[in-house]
Amino acid sequence: MTQPLVTTTRKGVIPTYPVLLGIVFAICTVGMTLNLVAAIATDVVDEGPRTLQEQLAGVIGFGLGSLAIAALGAWWCSRTGARSRLGAVLFGALCVPTLILFFSGAPGMFGATAAFLAGLTRGRTPSAGVPRVFGIVGLSVAILNVLVTILGVSIAWLGGGSPSAG
């Protein structure tokens, strides 16, 4: 027997899940994609192990894949309270090893999903205990992913080049 999740009219600075996920995707994945396209168009030379075109393919592929996994995972896990708690832990843990895919936005999207499933986004009832801890970790990673992407791209372009995405 499943019980519907109780939602609240929680207000605060943390937006609803679709808005939070959209912000992370737009800034990290779309923003980095546009950054790499601009770098390719302006013939910026990247001395990293991968070409700008390879980095672009990675950002798009991992970004879209992460978006699909995060959205489907949130949909499936949010159907019951037990799944939400388990999903918060799973996505909160998953956002840490995906830090290697930082500029694709993967850790931020998984972190936003952990925060949603832990009830930390607007319109949800917060969980207690371990799911809440993983939700806080996920929310922190999501915020940092956005801020560091903005800062990294800005500093790199002001310094005369494009940041390496991979």
Residue ranges and their predicted role:
Residues V89-A115:
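C-terminal halves and exits of single transmembrane alpha-helices
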Residues V59-W75, F91-C95:
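Generic alpha-helical transmembrane segments
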Residues T9-Y17, A68-A88, A114-V137:
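Cytoplasmic membrane-interface segments at the C-terminal ends of transmembrane helices
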Residues G65-A71, P107-L120, G138-L151:
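Juxtamembrane/interfacial segments around transmembrane helices
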Residues N145-G166:
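Juxtamembrane boundary at the C-terminal end of a transmembrane helix
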Residues M1-G63, V133-G135:
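Cytosolic juxtamembrane helix and N-cap/initiation of the first transmembrane helix
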Residues L99-S104, L120-V133, A142-G152:
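Juxtamembrane membrane-interface segments at transmembrane alpha-helix termini
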Residues E54-S66, L101-G111:
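Alpha-helical transmembrane segments of polytopic membrane proteins
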